[in-house]
């Protein structure tokens, strides 16, 4: 039988069984065989270990309490205390020895039968005497050995020579008892030797210590009455001598450990389990549990600890001091020596923190906050390169191959961009758009008659959608600039031309609406020629195509021009591997959740892929193409609508496929936290500027808005347009901007902040509708963006108070000053210009400085009250609440324009 099968039979692990064989001196492996004799030796060894364990019983008990500790600031602090008690119950020596004596008696009887010359009664008498003496000796020795064993358990104390003397004392007493036993009974040495061997064997089996018995001892179960008193006296004398010796040793230990500021715990009596705590004051207390809890043993480290401090891109002074386990005040002092004035909550950059850590003698470990993000992108690049190398080595045509061109249609509003795209796609999108204009960016994939694929991106033409047009330019390969034949070059046309120049993109000019009667194509060519677009028939390199979105004239020529241009560009991309895509538009659907429209740039996007997009992540649950059909995968230049993200990403964000969802979630959370920090930093900067503005005399008014939109792009456009409407006297403050219907939370926020709700192509939930109607909250619904902007402009003009301008209608110079009991100070003036009228606004100017603005209170001419005084006439002017008028001052009289 092998060790492995034997372990299964005895229900033990193979490692434990091999260890047991090693303990008895037999080396085995799990494939070795085992004999019957080796089994018996193993079982005997395991039984002995069990007996050794059963001789002791350990009891542990835990008590929980609360301790009130006063702190430096006067407040008490509660500390939870757990007291653990351990009590050991050992089998008394008399019980074990009785077991030994029983076995020994059996051996004596066998000896007596074999040797007739010894009498059984003599052996019994000797065994009784030996048992009595042995019990007494073992009891005393047990006390000493228990004391020594407990001392050996203490880590920072060793057994000293005093205890060795105590052991010698015990041996002397044992020898005296041995001589008494020899004198009482004189038996043959051979019988005593047999008894001694049996006793020692039993003691070895019980894992007990040697009792130091002499060779001529025998064992018995009964103790004679006349020997009890004498042996008891011997035990008492031994106990007294031991106690006196321990007291002397204890005083020596106290003197030696007086300066250690620690406690000495010693176990004296095994049956009582008392603890003596020796404090630095050399006083002995029994069971001082509170002192044992509060007074701790702590040794000050002699060497300075060098720590590894991990430093991010930014770290506060308090956090850095905690990592180095030093006080913040000490760290601030050290930084002041370096010439840095900081506070405890101030953030430090990575270089400064590294300098401080190295100055303190620790090791600085620099960590980039975006390390995980870089790791994911690096893994994606490695996978992409591996796939490319494999395909190149295999010379497979499925690697890099031609992709469909991405064509962006741009132009001024109402020049027919969407209508032209509808004719190409054989759809009617323009008729379903609100206001007849495009307000969202759209991507469509069109399959031509020759099975070639072209992806079109339709951009809005309104001036408010500047950012949306810029995003469309970043994705495109070819630009089709649509210009109406009856309208010519307009502002948004010029803007598109600027984008084309910045991106150095190939362009095709499509002159639309040539089916109208009033057209002037040559004028349009001349206008575009001034911007550097020279037609091919004029010797240039720009293609001009005349088209009509209504009749379809010239549309095929336009498509042919696009295909020719794409062949010249040789557009290729990887069609396998992890996909990369860019977000074109995103929205929130009540039944489907976040819906994201993406354009795949490289790789292959499949259902079930784990994706990371900005601050959001998720798994692709479903995909639809531009026609609304479900698809399983999408290649380069294919726009798809996917579901499964955790939230709504921003337009223009890159979507990448990753291998690990956990890492994707961590990167998304990191990006979200970083975005929040940037937002808070900008908010704090705005708060500082607002505090400075609040110091001005003129109060700046605010209009609070809550914006709800159907798509992410429309929401961004509305926010940017409202911010552009802010003036020095009126600020557009957007409290909340989100996607989806107006909810109860939006209504409550509008009620508490006195805000207006602007709902763009969205509805109101029933719960929010009740709150809005009950509290008369101002909410406006819009479907066209320029209607929204026009109404906001009217609101601003009605809110701002009309500006009042004044003009000077008369000037008077002060010649004399008079005092009147009724009117106070009266200025005697000569009118030098214009007319001075009563109750008009006036300014008092002294040496070119305006001293006072107020109202003309009284006007007299030769003690007669008059309403006006003309040029060249003297008059007296009384000014309300102002008496500091001097001779030579100029008084200007103002009137509203």
From Swiss-Prot:
GO molecular function: GTP binding; GTPase activity; translation initiation factor activity
Keyword hit for rRNA processing: no
Keywords, sorted A to Z: Cytoplasm, GTP-binding, Initiation factor, Nucleotide-binding, Protein biosynthesis
Record has Transcription regulation as a keyword: no
Species assigned in the record: Blochmanniella floridana
Database matches in InterPro entries: DNA-bd_dom_put_sf, EF-G-like_DII, IF2_assoc_dom_bac, IF2_II, IF2_N, P-loop_NTPase, Small_GTP-bd, T_Tr_GTP-bd_dom
GO CC term, one of those recorded: cytosol
Protein name: Translation initiation factor IF-2
Gene behind this protein: infB
Cellular localisation: Cytoplasm
Entry binding sites for GTP: 411-418, 458-462, 512-515
